[in-house]
Each structure stands twice: as C-alpha cells, then as structure tokens.
Amino acid sequence: MSKLIIGIDISMNDFYACIKVRTEDNSIKIKGTRSFENTDQGFENFLSWSLKQKKDDEWSVRFVMEATGVYYENLAYYLHSQNQKVSVVLANKIKNYIKSLNVKTKTDKVDAKTIASFGIERELENWEPMSPMYKTLRDL
C-alpha cells in the first residue's frame, strides 16, 4: 500500500504543506508544496488539495504537524473532525530530526518538507483531541 504524508509547518496566519508519497516500490516523491491561510476557509482548501493527490482509496493518508504553541490546534481539530489521520509531534523531536539530516536552511517550506520526511520514515500515533472539560480548564 502506498503512503501519502502531508507535512505541515504552521504559524499564526498561515501554514505550508508538503505532500510526500512512498510508493509500493519504496520510492519517495514530493507530490507538491503549497501555502494556505490559517483560517476555516484555508483548512477546507487545504484538505481538498491534499485529498486530490491520492491516486486511489488504497493509499494511506496522514497529516503530520509540530505542536507549536496553540497555532496547530484549530487545524488538528478540523482534520480530526473530517475523519483524517493526524499526528502531532513535539517540536524538539522535529528539531533533532532536522539536525540529524544536517539541514542548514530554515524556511517554512523546508520545514514542511522535513516534517513530511519524518512522517514517511516513522509509524506515528494518531492524535486525539483533549476532552472538552480539559480544554475548558486549560483555557481558563
């Protein structure tokens, strides 16, 4: 089965996404990169664009992002509500992964590509939203 990973580097106003695919012959290809607004409309456009990259229903799709402050939360909740597989990774894990690759350039686009590579190489756990009670307590 082919594996489609969407790496996401998110900030307050926008986010970059990079789609990488690992095919059955184990080759890895970049399918595309694009930026979107960090808004409800941006989320819809992003999901539509992402799912168009699937060749068939046999492909496994996973969205991978860093836990950066609270900026990732709205997108993670949106994707989860759309029954998508989401993985949220601690920022220090991504930082150490970038160091291991000896990546010198630091841009949102490069970070999205690196996050996608991280997701391609690993079996990541599904993110689950916190319960409404905990979310309310945290937001106090």
For the regions a protein language model found, what residue spans apply to each?
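Phosphate- and other anionic-substrate recognition elements at nucleic-acid/protein interfaces
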Residues: 1-140
